[in-house]
Amino acid sequence: MASARDLHAHRQRLLADEQGTLHKVARVRIALCYPSPYHVGMSSLGYQTIYREIHLHPGASAERVFLPDDVEAYRRTRTPLFTFESEAAVSGFPMLAFSVF
């Protein structure tokens, strides 16, 4: 049975294998959501392009959000959906963007 700590550790393992992760502080923060698990979302060239384009804008930054691999664990532990870059709760973002292609 996964705990909230396990959910965050899973995110950290995924990030450890990444290359080219973008980190930026900007006035406009956007949670860029993909309605599928991490591996599907990161295979989407459209999603990656939108992520990069947002970061090219001087006043905006994007943090990635994916459908959890284990949705039931999030519900059971009452873990809010959070971003990959900062583990910030999606509910705290002023803007949500969705990539569905």
Predicted regions and their residues:
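A short, structured N-terminal alpha-helical element that caps or precedes a catalytic domain
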Residues: 1-101
